[in-house]
Amino acid sequence: MDIKRVTVIVLDGVGIGEAPDADEYGDVGSHSLANTAAAINGLDLPNMAALGLGCISEMQGVACPESFSGSYGKMQPLSKGKDTVSGHWEMMGIVLPTPFPVYPDGFPAAVIEPFKQKIGRGVLGNKSASGTDILEELGMEHIRTGDPIVYTSADSVFQIAAHEDVITPKELYAMCEIAREILVGEHAVGRVIARPFIGDSPETFKRTIRRHDYALTPETPTILDKVVAAGKQVYSVGKIDDIFGNRGISVSNHTVDNAASLEAVLEFLDVDFEGLLFANFIEFDMIYGHRNDPVGYANALKAVDQRLPELQAKLRAGDLVVITADHGVDPTTPGSNHSREYVPLLVFGPEVRSGVNLGTRQTLSDLAATIAEIFGLEQPLHGTSFLSELQ
């Protein structure tokens, strides 16, 4: 088996059961897939089922098949954090020994005061809140005062919300860059996020697609860096470029929804290249998981599942595809935060063995180790390749 292209598709927030340390995060009982299935009386995912999804963990409507089109397993998060950045970095070989800082009581004066001074405005909020709730609470005051809304969550994020007619997206992005410069050292949050919105009342406020993330960059090279350094290509889809600070990426298509992300993946698969295609499908997390909408979550899964045959038809000899996730965000549990869960591992390709139980991998960095072995790169500090099990 001579693999030339690896495609990694991250179903953002699609966890597959509580991790062993879920109690440390308040996430006992979380299971994004199975709990969603139970809430809607069964998932309809025949193509992922054929890959082995139902063999990883029981979930209503998704059985373990008699005939497989892929191999399957699950990966346990090792990094001390359950956020998007930690999950994606770990997949690419960076395990964080300490979590990014969080601010359940809001940001201290050492952060807020210089931020206010540099943007020349006050701020509203400065607390932990749901993104939709805080717009209902403070959106009208923001329109009246012109002050941006600053808030956080259980994740390591500094989020700035602003109405597009009050503070333009360009101005909002500049504020985020200022915040990113301030948030270093002990206050080095994982992400600064621009959250533009529209509407003229609490009932009509709606976040727009012009969200933008400003993530820290890894201190050591990731597999992305190593693939590019070896003279190969890295194509990114969705917010991958933001998550890695545009580092180790040859070409990016910053899509903002699942349908556009899938189209971008299909287009990149038409390109004759050797290297890595890394895509994030955001809607499970951003639109449905955080808003506790299991019906929408299930429908989004079904929409991706229905188009998997199109992706499979694009594959050629030398292709290997991985479908996984970065963390959970169980839409059926109280609260709107991420959940500490295992993530699914589905692997397939024209020359890849099917029906192999890859078991429980001890870190998401097993994916990085596998990519490193495929391309003859230096192995990451963490992770064990599963390539030999697929040959």
From Swiss-Prot:
A single MF term (Gene Ontology): magnesium ion binding
InterPro entries: Alkaline_phosphatase_core_sf, DeoB, Metalloenzyme, Phosphopentomutase_DeoB_cap_sf
Reactions performed catalytically: 2-deoxy-alpha-D-ribose 1-phosphate = 2-deoxy-D-ribose 5-phosphate; alpha-D-ribose 1-phosphate = D-ribose 5-phosphate
Cofactor(s) the protein needs: Mn(2+)
GO biological process, any: metabolic compound salvage
Keywords: Cytoplasm, Isomerase, Manganese, Metal-binding
Pathway linked to the protein: Carbohydrate degradation; 2-deoxy-D-ribose 1-phosphate degradation; D-glyceraldehyde 3-phosphate and acetaldehyde from 2-deoxy-alpha-D-ribose 1-phosphate: step 1/2
Stored SUPFAM superfamilies: Alkaline phosphatase-like, DeoB insert domain-like
Superkingdom, natural source: Bacteria
Record text on cofactor binding: Binds 2 manganese ions.
GO terms for cellular component: cytosol
E.C. designation(s): 5.4.2.7
Pfam families noted in UniProt: Metalloenzyme
Subcellular location: Cytoplasm
Binding-site list for Mn(2+) 2: 285, 290, 338
Binding site for Mn(2+) 1: 12, 326-327
Signal peptide: none
Database matches in PANTHER family: PHOSPHOPENTOMUTASE
Family to which this protein belongs: Belongs to the phosphopentomutase family.
Function, in words: Isomerase that catalyzes the conversion of deoxy-ribose 1-phosphate (dRib-1-P) and ribose 1-phosphate (Rib-1-P) to deoxy-ribose 5-phosphate (dRib-5-P) and ribose 5-phosphate (Rib-5-P), respectively.
Protein name: Phosphopentomutase
